[in-house]
Amino acid sequence: MSSFTHFNDQGRAKMVDISDKKATVRTAIACSSIVVTKEIYDKISHNEIGKGDVLAVAQIAGIMAAKRTSDIIPMCHPLLLKGVDVSFDWKQSEEQYRLLIEVKVKTEGSTGVEMEALTAASATALTVYDMCKAVDKGMIIGETYLLEKTGGKSGDYTRNS
C-alpha cells in the first residue's frame, strides 16, 4: 500500500518535491454530472437562461478551473497545461435530464493532471448550477471521479465500471 506523500517527518503538510521526477506526457480524464428538470433542459437547449449560454460559460469555467487548480488545492503544483477539453452529453430518464461532463487535461511535466481534471469537472457542474438556480434550486450535482490517467511513475489508470 502506498503512503501519503504530503506530510513531512513531523507529520505536517508539505508540497512534494518533484524536481527529480522525469518530465513525461501526462493525461487525465475526469467526469461529473448534474441532474436538471425538463424545464431547465429545454431552457439550456434553446439558450433561454437569462445569464447566457450555459454550456459555453460552463465550458470556459471548467477550462479556467483547470488552469487555476493550484490556487485552490493547497499542495497542488502549478502546471503548464498543454490542453483542456470540456465536453457534454445529455442522458434522459423520465422527467430528469442528466448532463454528463467529461474533462480531458494534458501536460508534459513532472507531475500528473488528475487534480486539474477533477477540479475542472467540478467547476463545470457548479457553473451550470449557478447559471440555472433561478429556475430551480433542486438540481443535483452527481459523482465526480477520475475516469482515466496516463503517464508518470505510478503508471496508467482506468476506472473499473
Swiss-Prot record:
Pfam families to which the protein is assigned, alphabetical: MoaC
Record has Metal-binding as a keyword: no
InterPro entries found in the cross-reference section: MoaC, MoaC_bact/euk, MoaC_sf, MoCo_biosynth_MoaA/MoaC, Mopterin_CF_biosynth-C_dom
Binding site residues for substrate: M75, C76, H77, M115, E116
Broadest EC class assigned to this enzyme: lyase
Keywords: Lyase, Molybdenum cofactor biosynthesis
Catalytic residues (UniProt): D130
Annotated metabolic or biological route of this protein: Cofactor biosynthesis; molybdopterin biosynthesis
HAMAP family: MoaC_B
Assigned protein family: Belongs to the MoaC family.
The protein's role, per its UniProt record: Catalyzes the conversion of (8S)-3',8-cyclo-7,8-dihydroguanosine 5'-triphosphate to cyclic pyranopterin monophosphate (cPMP).
Record's protein name: Cyclic pyranopterin monophosphate synthase
Taxonomic placement: Bacteria, Bacillati, Bacillota, Bacilli, Bacillales
